[in-house]
Amino acid sequence: MAKENKKKRKRRRILLSLLMILFCGVILSTSTYAWFTANKTVTINDITVNVAAMNGLQISVDAINWKPTITTADIRGAQATYPTAVNQLPSELSSLSPVSSVGDIDTSTGFMQMYAGEIQTGTGGGNILTATRSTETHGENGNFIAFDVFIQTTALTQVYLTSNSRVTASGASSGIENAARIAFVNEGNAATGTAPTTIQQLKSTGTPAPFIWEVNNDVHTAAAVQNANSVYHQTTQQTDADPLEYYGVKADIGAGLDIPLDSQDGTYFEKVTPSASTGVDGIPTTAYQSLMQLQPGITKVRIYMWVEGQDVDCENNASGGSLTFSLQISSNTSADGA
């Protein structure tokens, strides 16, 4: 009898162990991780840049050849007449990886400082974030999109993002479009007639600060809602959500620092307040989004497009998605031509 009871206890222990393993398996399969720990890339399906020529507004990729609209082919081919161009546009066969930025400018180049992050296991066994500066190079590779445009105006002109400006999923949505950002850096202005080589070398001093646009801020997938709660300790919902605060990366983070994912340490992170934040319905046709005021002459603007790693929507289930970036700038305030 004692031997039989011992066997029963052993079977119960085995059953309990199996149940614990199954339970742990469920936890692991439903966990979400910021910055992607699985497939770390996002496919770029299309980049559409369209600038409407209204009230004397014209655009160029080299400050030489002016037209009402520029294409991705124009941007990729800019070095033919703008030899020092650094236009980083990953091809449709390439991909993006999450990066983070607070909008700081490297005044030696005029580039916005971007940081590529990676999740590692800390000395205590938990997940930590490491980050290294990711600087753009000319070509069809890179972690993010960056390119220069030149806008010519005949008078002081306020320009706007139209309702045709948006970031959407290509095909089935993974939710990664909800972590996208677009930024505009005013690199400087020169009088019409200034040598193109001089205009091409304009560099931002950091003032004015870059215009950072957060898109699709009011929708999240179920996994992103969980990520917000479990990693960043924020409560949100899948639709009609309030904008969530986030802390962008502003410095390199070494593995030995053991910086946790939810850190707000001011040495490495800074709260980002986007210049514009719009929901999934986008910019309304009745009221375009104010972008910047252009001085008469030629203004160099550097444009960035990226997946923000510190956004709650940047999590494993969203990796491998496909994005389309569309951009249209106008001097009109609405679709009715006002």
Residue ranges and their predicted role:
Residues 38, 115-178, 224-338:
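C-terminal, structured domain-capping segment
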Residues 80-103, 183-267:
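Low-complexity, serine/threonine/proline-enriched polar segments
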Residues 54-61, 169-197, 334-337:
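Short aromatic-acidic-glycine turn motif
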Residues 3-94, 317-338:
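Short, polar/proline-rich extracytoplasmic segments that appear immediately after membrane translocation
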Residues 48, 53, 153-155, 186:
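Short, flexible loop/turn elements at secondary-structure junctions
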Residues 63-134, 143-145:
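N-terminal pilin/flagellin-like segments and related low-complexity appendage regions
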